[in-house]
Amino acid sequence: MSKKVLVVGVFDLFHRGHVEFLKKAATFGDELIILINGDEMTEKYKRRPIYSEQDRAAILSALSCVTVVEITNSFDVKPYIEKYNIDVIVHGNDWEHDSYLEQIRCTEEYLRQQNVTMAYTDYHSSVSTSALLKQIKEL
């Protein structure tokens, strides 16, 4: 039985930091499932994305390490954990564990019940969408 990995993110202005993160996330299992935060959701909590949710999904779907891409406008990942029988959720270590669980609407107890573990990868702030946007504004 294959091990399924879930990552969640906006993935706007796709860059090398995203590539490195997804390559690392893929090493935690056999199938990589990506939930893209939809346009509506992203605009409410962050900013309006530069690329549409469909464009971001197309870019991610083209990567060989990616098995499934879905767009969501909900922070709650429980339906996707159950739909895909997720084994591991991977995120950058720029988030504190409890804050991230709150963001994705999960509890430690729920994850234990579902046999889901959390894994965190190094976050490289030198390569980020925010940094790219800042550079573009300075042109």
Describe the function of each predicted region.
Residues M1-L139:
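Nucleotidyltransferase catalytic core that binds NTPs
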